Amino acid sequence: CPQRSERLGWTGDAQVFAPTASYHMDTRAFFHKFIKDLRDEQKELDGGMPNFLPNIGHKEKAGSVWGDIATFLPNTLYTYFGNEEEMEYCYPLMKDWVDFIDRGDAARGERKYLFDFMDTFGDWLALDGPTPTSFKGSTNDTFISSV
C-alpha cells in the first residue's frame, strides 16, 4: 500500500499493479524472483498464498485478490512478454492455488466454486450496507455527473 508508506510486499497490490509495471518496463526478473518466493511460501501454507512477501511470521493464508496473484501474475507476464517457459515454471504455483480453493470449497460441503470462505481485508469497502453518514466530499454537485 504505497499510499500508507507500507514496507511489505502485499500480494494484492502486486497483483493489481503488475500489468501497469510490465507495460512500462521489463519486470520479468523482478517478478520471477517474486514468484519463486511465493512458491516457497505456498509450500509452507499447504497450497495457500501469503498476504505479503517476505512473509515475516504471518502464517495466515490469503483470501481472494491477495491470493489470486498465483494465477494473475503468471498470466500478466505471459501477456506482456509471451514467455511460455515462465508459464511452465508457474504451473505448480497456479495449480496448487486452485486446488487449495477447491479443497476449501469441498470442506464446507459446498461445490459453489466461489472463493468466499476466507477472510479478506476490504478495509476500504463497506459490504454490509449503507453508512449513516454521507462521504460525498465538498465538490459542488454541478461538477459531478453522477449526482
Report each predicted region and the residues it spans.
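Alpha-helical scaffold elements that line and support the substrate/ligand-binding pocket
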Residues: F17, A70-T79
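Active-site acid/base region of carbohydrate-active enzymes
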Residues: C1-F52, K61, Y80-I144
